[in-house]
Structure formats: C-alpha cells, structure tokens
C-alpha cells in the first residue's frame, strides 16, 4: 500500500474510534444524569410517606396504661437486669449514685437514679455519703446499662424522687431544697406542671421508687415529719402532671416512709418502711378516689432491717428491733404475700424472696418458697417494686417485678465515696433459680489509695 494511503487509513480508523468513544462518554453522562434525576424525584416523593409513617407511629405509641388487671400468678423470679455500674466505673465514666429504681412505660423500661454530681474514681466523689445536697439530680438511662454521662437523660434536680409513665408521657416527682422547706417539682413530658410545698417543714420526702398509674391518673405517697416518731403522710393523685386531689392519712402510731407502690385490679397497694418502731412493713391501699385502708403485714417472716429472728408476727407495728429500717417491698396475693428482704437481720447484706401463703393476714412464720438473690456475704441495700403493664408484655395481667440496690463504699468499706449498682427480677410462672448476683467490684479504687 502507498505509504501516504496507509497513513490516511490509520488516521481515519483512529478518528472513527475517537468519535465512537466520545459518543459512548456522552451517552454515559446522559445516563447518569437521568438516573440521578429519577432517584432525586423518588426521594422527594418518599419523604411525605416517611413522615406520615412517623406521625402514625407517634399516634399509636400513646396509650392509657389501664392498671385494671390483676397481678400475674407467679411461682418465682427470673433475672431481668444487672448494670455492673461499680465494676465498669473503676475504668469508665460512671455516675456516683444512690436510690436507683426502675419504671416501665408501654415501650421500654428505664433505670432512674439520684446522682451526686460526680463520677466514680474522681475527686468529686469524696463525701458522697450525704443524702441531701444541692448537687443531687434525678437522671435515667436504659435498664441494665451502667449510668454514665453518655447514655443518661437529665430529669430534674432532686434528693428524693419518684417517676412513672401513664401511657402518654413520663411523670417525674423531684424534691429538692432545705430540710425545713423543700419543694417537690412535678414534670410531665419534661415540662414543669406543678409543685408541692413541704407542709410540716421537716424533710419532705417521697418513694425512691416508681409511682403507680391507673386509667391515666398517677399516684404517689409523701412523708413530712420526724423519721423516728409520728409524721404526716399524704397520698397525691395526679393527672398529666398536675395534682388533682390529695388526702392525709389518719394513721396514729403508724410510720410510712419510702413506699413501694403498684397497681392491682384498678387500685393501688403500697408497702413502706417504718423507721420509727416496726420491724414489719406498714401498707396502705387505696382506690382512684383515694379511699384508703391501712395496716401492717402480719407475717412472722419479718421484712425490715434491722429485725428480730422470725417468730410470731403482728398486724400492728412489731416493736422488737423496730427502730431504723431500709426501703423494701412486698406483693400481696389474697391472704398470701411475697416478701423481699435482706438475708442479714442487722446489716444491709444478702437478699432473698419468700412466699408466705398466709402472711398478709396470718402471724405465723411458715413459708413455702425461698429464692436466693444475693448471698449474705455480699452487700445489698434498698429494694423496691415496679410492674410491667399488659401494654408492654402482651400478657393479660400485670407482671410484678423488683429491683435491689447493691451499695458499695462508705460507711462499710474503705473508700471516700458511696455508690451502688442494681439488679432486677420479674415474676414468672415457669422455672427459676436461686443464686447470688452481687455487685462484684474490687475495692478500693485508685482515688481511695
């Protein structure tokens, strides 16, 4: 072939290849642009659907926790949670707390707790054995998680508190201020809705466990007056965070502190602490109109600490070893009662659950079930009740549950701080096991040395 023709032929082929390549690139660009336009259009069209779904879910999420069901029949207690807060706090950022308690909505269970405005293993943890200070706040986190700045929600300023969910929003009751004039601040959905002023000017205090909600109304019990003598006790009925009714108990020779309350068949039962002169626990039950009955658990299986050895009980205050006490709970089933108590009779150590089939009304000390929760060689502390409503569990009854505070540090151990972790159990009508679920932290910490 002529050299010039060869050059022309090769040039023509290269030009054709270049034109084809250019057309392919233009086609690719057009394809990408069309595809992007379609995706953008679909995205904009999907947004109203997404928002509609979100709003629908929010609407469905609001219910009324009726509280009209009876407590579920149970044969024992299944482990529900353990937060290991002190163990984790030796290395991680965990709050110094006390008075933890659990409450459940129809969607979730949360651990509420009173912080000391300090973290474990930090200088501000020094001296945190004090109950009432302006630094204490009520916070909450998902149940079973160690309470830290990263997973906790601020609720209110408080050194005594309660909280519960009515099916629409959380209600918090938070007491703070001076001993001679404290005020309880009520918040509903995080907004201040009402206040309650100390009426005896002597350390207004409340449950340190969940309030009880029935048919959209929530109920709590408060105490004002001496911790070692006759005080004043009131039941409050609240709706959407506002007090709509209250009644003062006519209860001479009774002492009610730190009540553990739960709904049962449309009414509320509270089992409390007698810090004056009872080693058995006082109770108050009331309907939605605040018509009430009062008494003491009659069983010879005594529930407070300190307490005498089990023996013959009393349907009034059992005065032997009756002074002082610890927050606790029981669940009434007809004439029978599940009693939660420390294993030790004179220190806050160990924990057990006992079923006394005649203990609500009978004074003998016979029981048929004992389930170990914490060994007597390990520290316990406060304990209290909470429930899971049918709207959460899908059951046709209210599930009884309880939590146990596992106190560590001062005054029993060589630390500069006092704090605790917690465990919880729920009642089931199936197989359970007794064991020991202690706090398990190795003390002292670095800050203590």
Swiss-Prot record:
Catalyzes the removal of terminal sialic acid residues from viral and cellular glycoconjugates. Cleaves off the terminal sialic acids on the glycosylated HA during virus budding to facilitate virus release. Additionally helps virus spread through the circulation by further removing sialic acids from the cell surface. These cleavages prevent self-aggregation and ensure the efficient spread of the progeny virus from cell to cell. Otherwise, infection would be limited to one round of replication. Belongs to the glycosyl hydrolase 34 family. Its cofactor is Ca(2+). Its main location: virion. Intact N-terminus is essential for virion morphogenesis. Possesses two apical sorting signals, one in the ectodomain, which is likely to be a glycan, and the other in the transmembrane domain. The transmembrane domain also plays a role in lipid raft association. It catalyses: Hydrolysis of alpha-(2->3)-, alpha-(2->6)-, alpha-(2->8)- glycosidic linkages of terminal sialic acid residues in oligosaccharides, glycoproteins, glycolipids, colominic acid and synthetic substrates. It is found in: Virion membrane; Host apical cell membrane. The keyword Hydrolase applies. The influenza A genome consist of 8 RNA segments. Genetic variation of hemagglutinin and/or neuraminidase genes results in the emergence of new influenza strains. The mechanism of variation can be the result of point mutations or the result of genetic reassortment between segments of two different strains. Residues 36-70 are annotated as: Hypervariable stalk region. SUPFAM superfamilies: Sialidases. It comes from the Viruses. The active site is at residues 131, 382. GO terms for biological process: carbohydrate metabolic process; viral budding from plasma membrane. GO terms for cellular component: host cell plasma membrane; membrane; virion membrane. This is Neuraminidase. Inhibited by the neuraminidase inhibitors zanamivir (Relenza) and oseltamivir (Tamiflu). These drugs interfere with the release of progeny virus from infected cells and are effective against all influenza strains. Resistance to neuraminidase inhibitors is quite rare. It comes from Influenza A virus (strain A/Chicken/Hong Kong/37.4/2002 H5N1 genotype X2). Homotetramer. Its EC number is 3.2.1.18. Ca(2+) binds at residues 274, 278, 304. Substrate binds at residues 98, 132, 257-258, 273, 348. Residues 11-33 are annotated as: Involved in apical transport and lipid raft association. Residues 28-449 are virion surface. Residues 71-449 are annotated as: Head of neuraminidase.
